Structure formats: C-alpha cells, structure tokens
Design a protein with these regions (language model features):
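The conserved beta1-alpha1 loop
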Residues: 167-169, 336
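Acidic helix/loop microenvironments that form the catalytic cleft of cell-wall polysaccharide enzymes
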Residues: 169-171, 253-254
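Active-site-proximal cap/loop segments of hydrolase catalytic domains
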Residues: 184, 189, 199-400
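Short beta-strand segments enriched for Tyr within beta-sheet-rich domains
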Residues: 161, 195, 269-270
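Histidine-centered divalent metal-coordination motifs
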Residues: 146, 168, 373
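Peripheral, non-catalytic segments that deliver or gate enzyme domains
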Residues: 1-146, 150-160, 171-182, 186-193, ...
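Hydrophobic beta-strand anchors of alpha/beta hydrolase catalytic cores
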Residues: 164-166, 197
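The start of beta-strands in P-loop NTPase/AAA+ ATPase cores
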Residues: 161-163, 331
Length: 400
C-alpha cells in the first residue's frame, strides 16, 4: 500500500512517496479514512503520512518534522506522540498516549523549545491499564490476520486464564486501535478482573490491506466465523488460555457472531455475550423499522457481504442465529437498547423466544430505555458491566 504523486492533467500516477507493506495508507480498501496525509499549515505542503497499523506510525518526509518527532519521543518516552501544527503555524499540538495511559495533550513552542501540558484524559489511570499486545495469526486458508490480546496484570509465562474472545462490530469496520476502541475498553475492564481477552481483526476489517478486506465478502457466517475460531486457536497455542473456560462476546456484528458461534462450534465456548445483535438477516435488511433497509447502498453492500442477492434464501437462514436457535449450546447473556434503529430490538425478542422454546433461555436479557445502538448513559453502562461481570464469574469463575 502506498501514496503516489498524481498528475491530474495526464491522469497518471507519478513517483511513489511513501509505502507500507502491510497497512493501508490514506484510505482503507472500503474507502474509509484510516490514516492522514499531513500538511504544513503555513503553505499546505505535504510533510508526512500517518499509518494506522496495530500501532500508529508517522512517516515524515520533511526533515524538520522528523527531528521534532525524535525530540518529542525522547522526552515523552514509551508513548505514541502524534502532533499537528496550530492554524497560525506558531506551535504544535501533541497528543501523547500509550496502551497503558490515556491521552495527554501538550503545546510545543518550537521557537522557545517549551512543552506545556494543556489537558489530560483520566490521568488517574496512567500506568494502571493492562498492556495491549498486538499479534498476527494465520486463518485456516492461509490468510494472514491481526489482532490484540490482553492479560491480567502480573501474568507469568505458563499462567492460564479464563478467556473472552471479543468480536468487533461492523463487520466491515475498524473498531479497535492502539489504546482506544469499544473492544479495547471492554478488554481493559475484563483483564483487570482476571480474564484474558482476545480481539481479532478478522477478514473484512479495513486498514490491513485489500486482500484481508475483500476476502471477507461473501463469507458472512462462514469463513468470517472461522477467523474467530482460528484466533482462539492461536491464543491457545500461546499457552495463556484455559480452554475449558472460554466465552465469546460482542455487540452488533459481534453480538451476531457470538450467538452464531455457539451454534456453529458447540463446545468451543461455554457462554456468549450478545449485544445489539442482528439475528434474522432477511428481517434486518428488509424491515423499515431499521435504517439499513432504507439505504439502497447499505442493502447492496450487505448483499455482497452475505454473498447472495436473495435475502429469502435458505443460505441466508443458515447464517441467521434465529434459525439455528436449537443448535445454540451454552449460557447466553443478551442486551439491547429499546430505541435501536440500526438493529431493531424485535430481533432480540425473536431469538429470546426461540432460545426459550429450545430449552436454553437467556440467563439475562438487559434492555435499556431511551438507548439505541449502544448505550450512552453512564449509569446504564455501569449496570450493564456489573451484570456482565457477574455472568462471567458465574460461568467461568476466574481464580482471582
């Protein structure tokens, strides 16, 4: 993946300015911006590029900016230091953070060579967050994929932990990055309570090259799910997983995958946490109660992800948890927002009834009023995670 000069008159690519063999630059394969072209505020000249890999990286082509980066990195050690120039061009705003420390913002005066802290996010957490480990793994078809894992503080080689495989939403979205993201936040909560957590960037996750992205199309409920299992297999091979105590979790697509994996790989996971989950893909893409069916481009891309134009086909039923409820073995925890217009709550009630009819009613189904596709109120999130932790403790019983 690279950034080239472009001649608009000749409509031709020119010289290669910067490249990365693994990560997208400028924009991901799905068109979303994953990394920025950096320009000088004074003259709009291109001075560098930002690569959003497993850890963010800045490639400077301007020598002075490269020297400034080196100076900041030597002062703010063991942190990722991203900076941009103020609109008046007189100073730099620095965003400094790490996997174990929330962001702090500084103002760097180049002329005076002074660095002044101007804001901090949750400074009481500095150094107290669990370490975020990037990893690479190969899917069963040979596709190289990436992810992160977290271990409880004080973990030693040979220690085995109850483990949560957290699946991000989308699925065609980059949900987690270095030090931030819904999955990263959940992993931090769980790791501080004695759990190991694995966050796979499965096929169709943008930002990791066109092959990894486009390999996901047509594999919904199939190879995409294989990747979740293969990430767990990698983690088991690393030696930190207690294979008898593994749960799968996620929201939106991640909630879908959590339910479908219990049906697809019985015995692999003891339990599932499924939030905001589409459970009937035909309903999801046709009901006007939700916003997806109202978007022609949205339905079109979803048909390509499913690999079929026929939403009423048996193939779509086969990858819908609602029609596999009798195969779902293991304890299920569900949650939803009453006002969700992305995944209408009716689907969650459908799977609740289907699981109950199959003799495996959800252990808990948390519904919050005036919440949508994700909970925004602090009190609702506190209650949700209090209940999730109790559920996991009951199912997996961590030693500490």
């Amino acid at each position: 993946m690279g950034v080239f000069r472009y001649d608009p008159a000749a409509k031709k690519l020119g010289e290669l300015i910067a490249s990365n063999p693994r990560y997208d630059m400028g924009a991901a394969a799905n068109g979303s911006r994953v990394a920025g072209v950096l320009t000088n505020a004074k003259d709009n000249k291109i001075v560098g590029y930002r690569v959003a890999g497993l850890k963010p990286e800045t490639i400077w082509i301007d020598e002075q900016y490269a020297k400034t980066q080196a100076a900041l990195d030597s002062t703010l050690k063991d942190r990722t230091n991203l900076f941009s120039r103020t609109p008046d061009g007189k100073a730099l705003v620095v965003n400094s953070f790490s996997d174990q420390a929330p962001p702090r913002w500084y103002l760097f005066d180049e002329e005076k060579r002074t660095l002044e802290e101007i804001a901090a996010s949750k400074p009481w957490l500095d150094g107290k967050l669990p370490e975020q480990h990037p990893f690479f793994f190969k899917a069963r078809d040979g596709l190289e994929l990436t992810g992160y894992y977290f271990l409880p503080k004080g973990a030693k080689p040979g220690d085995k932990f109850p483990t949560i495989v957290h699946i991000h939403g989308g699925p065609h979205a980059r949900a987690d990055s270095w030090g931030s993201g819904f999955g990263v936040s959940e992993a931090r909560i769980l790791a501080t309570r004695g759990y190991a957590v694995v966050l796979p960037n499965f096929r169709i996750t943008p930002g990791f090259g066109s092959k990894a992205y486009y390999s996901g199309f047509g594999t919904y409920g199939k190879q995409m799910l294989d990747d979740h299992e293969d990430a767990l297999k990698w983690a088991v091979g690393e030696g930190f997983v207690d294979s008898s105590r593994v749960c799968i979790s996620g929201a939106s697509y991640g909630g879908y995958a959590s339910l479908q994996m219990l049906a697809r790989a019985p015995g692999l996971f003891k339990c599932a946490i499924a939030g905001l989950a589409p459970t009937d893909m035909e309903y999801q893409l046709t009901t006007l109660e939700g916003d997806t069916a109202r978007s022609e481009p949205g339905v079109k891309i979803w048909k390509s992800i499913l690999g079929t134009e026929d939403l009423g086909s048996q193939a779509v039923k086969d990858v819908s948890p609602l029609f596999n409820a009798s195969k779902i073995k293991g304890a299920v925890f569900m949650y939803a927002g009453r006002d969700d217009i992305r995944v209408p709550i009716a689907q969650m009630y459908k799977i609740e009834r289907a699981l109950t009819s199959a003799g495996n009613p959800p252990v808990a189904f948390v519904v919050k009023e005036k919440e949508g596709h994700g909970f925004g109120k602090l009190e609702n999130n506190l209650d949700l995670y209090t209940q999730i932790l109790k559920f996991l403790d009951d199912q997996l019983k961590p030693k500490s």
